[in-house]
Amino acid sequence: MTLLGTALRPAATRVMLLGSGELGKEVAIECQRLGVEVIAVDRYADAPAMHVAHRSHVINMLDGDALRRVVELEKPHYIVPEIEAIATDMLIQLEEEGLNVVPCARATKLTMNREGIRRLAAEELQLPTSTYRFSDSESLFREAVAAIGYPCIVKPVMSSSGKGQTFIRSAEQLAQAWEYAQQGGRAGAGRVIVEGVVKFDFEITLLTVSAVDGVHFCAPVGHRQEDGDYRESWQPQQMSPLALERAQEIARKVVLALGGYGLFGVELFVCGDEVIFSEVSPRPHDTGMVTLISQDLSEFALHVRAFLGLPVGGIRQYGPAASAVILPQLTSQNVTFDNVQNAVGADLQIRLFGKPEIDGSRRLGVALATAESVVDAIERAKHAAGQVKVQG
């Protein structure tokens, strides 16, 4: 039996978000729908989820002592990481002391580091992956590239949004690629992964829910990446029945091996009927924002339902849908959005995240659309995103 208290009362059920960006904001809103008390934590003030939380705190989430202090102050029943850059060793300690980390501290630690999740997938679970080598010095990095061959990709083992990544075509790029990887890691200079290039037809995110009533799958989400970040996503991505079956089997093995209840974003390469594991996030995925319009239960609603111990039952997908990011480039601490009236309409929505500032290029919103076909949905979403004029 799941017992939920009422927010701001003595018996409240408390959820602490570690990371309060646009994904955390939607998780907070879903918690609010169930009367759950929300505490939003991030490294900067006025982060999106803080706008819809009961309380908020600004800390360095890589500082384990600071993390412990805020947890001891708020006494959450659930700790919900939204990002990778967290003191995961402290999360493991807190979990050992009886706190509930979503989906579990081990999953958060393994997926924070590309080495942890790659070794789990390729070596323990024997899943198909790209060829790879790990290196912690420039000389070993050069040896790894020689072993993998050209072209290849180098990434810091701890980074996100394409930071520190280089597509290497020749030996002339090696020195610069190593230096860039050292600058782009979340925890500073360190270890890298060198990966062989996988030939694939498309990439998908298979949003996979591990819940009290079993493992559930959303329809596959296709997406287009640019500079390491997604630009558009769509659902459903068409693929063969055999490829879908293989994708679901890989995703099932990964989420059960990681453990815990919640939604996982399992990233896969698809080539014909073949499916290759890429990465996994133990939390809602940015490409999954399309589910805000494409499903009866968004990825955020599914995540909350799962980690609270509630059954999912089933997931209804409404048909072709797409998302397109609103990604301006400017510098401002007083952003405004003009021409919004032309970005909404029948089966056409936007979400503006409420980020407090921008300095360069930053994702500030997303357009969402449905249509008779995926192609039309993508075009509608892209057009709507382009209608929003960001000023500051």
UniProtKB/Swiss-Prot annotation:
> Which keywords belong to this entry?
ATP-binding, Ligase, Magnesium, Metal-binding, Nucleotide-binding, Purine biosynthesis
Q: Which domain of life is it from?
A: Bacteria
Q: Name one GO molecular function term.
A: magnesium ion binding
List the catalysed reactions.
Answer: N(1)-(5-phospho-beta-D-ribosyl)glycinamide + formate + ATP = N(2)-formyl-N(1)-(5-phospho-beta-D-ribosyl)glycinamide + ADP + phosphate + H(+)
Q: Which Pfam families match?
A: ATP-grasp (PF02222), PurT_C (PF21244), RS_preATP-grasp-like (PF22660)
Which EC class is the enzyme in? ligase
Q: Where does N(1)-(5-phospho-beta-D-ribosyl)glycinamide bind?
A: 22-23, 82, 286, 355, 362-363
Protein's pathway: Purine metabolism; IMP biosynthesis via de novo pathway; N(2)-formyl-N(1)-(5-phospho-D-ribosyl)glycinamide from N(1)-(5-phospho-D-ribosyl)glycinamide (formate route): step 1/1
InterPro entries from the UniProt entry? ATP-grasp, ATP-grasp_carboxylate-amine, ATP_grasp_subdomain_1, PreATP-grasp_dom_sf, PurT, PurT/PurK_preATP-grasp, PurT_C, Rudment_hybrid_motif
Q: Which PROSITE patterns match?
A: ATP_GRASP
Its GO CC terms are:
cytosol
Positions binding Mg(2+) in this chain are 267, 279
Subunit structure of this entry?
Answer: Homodimer.
Q: Which family does it belong to?
A: Belongs to the PurK/PurT family.
* Name the record gives this protein: Formate-dependent phosphoribosylglycinamide formyltransferase
List the source organism. Answer: Shigella dysenteriae serotype 1 (strain Sd197)
Gene name linked to the record: purT
